[in-house]
Swiss-Prot record:
Membrane topology: Multi-pass membrane protein
Entry protein name: Protein SirB2
GO cellular component: plasma membrane
Cell compartment(s), UniProt: Cell inner membrane
Location, primary (coarse class): membrane
Cell membrane is among the record's keywords: yes
Protein task: Required for maximal expression of sirC, not required to invade host cells.
PANTHER family registered for this protein in UniProt: PROTEIN YCHQ
Length: 129
């Protein structure tokens, strides 16, 4: 698979993953039946797995490694992804373990972190130097 194909797959998965995250949060917030639909528990992890695999493929093909001088932006991006995942879990908490207020705060914070991840990926300039 070429770098262009991997990048295209990665970007499509990003768009689908973010769109489903926003939709699932909205459905949950509004109490819509789609929030509890079976497919909303199956499809997002499949897309996120493809996203992860395409990202690993891009790392292998481009030889840009995290935790190196040339890959410092990628290191920051990976930490951002971890923070985004944690905030996403809080925002979409289906066990009702967290308050509505915690979910309400976690959702926009996740979107801010997502913006930072996208900025790092597009500029390849680390925020922390």
């Amino acid at each position: 698979m070429t770098i262009a194909m991997l990048l295209t797959l990665h970007l499509i998965c990003v768009a689908l993953s973010v769109s489903l995250f926003v939709a699932r949060y909205w459905w949950r917030y509004c109490g819509h039946a789609l929030a509890a639909a079976r497919w909303t528990r199956i499809v997002p992890p499949v897309i996120d797995t493809l996203l992860l695999l395409s990202g690993i493929g891009l790392i292998v093909k481009t030889h840009i490694l995290p935790f190196t001088e040339s890959g410092s932006w990628l290191t920051e991006k990976l930490f951002g992804v971890i923070i985004y995942i944690v905030l996403g879990f809080i925002a979409l908490d289906y066990r009702q373990a967290r308050s509505q207020q915690a979910r309400f705060i976690a959702f926009p914070l996740a979107l801010v972190v997502l913006y930072i991840i996208i900025k790092l990926a597009t500029t390849k300039i680390p925020l922390l130097g």
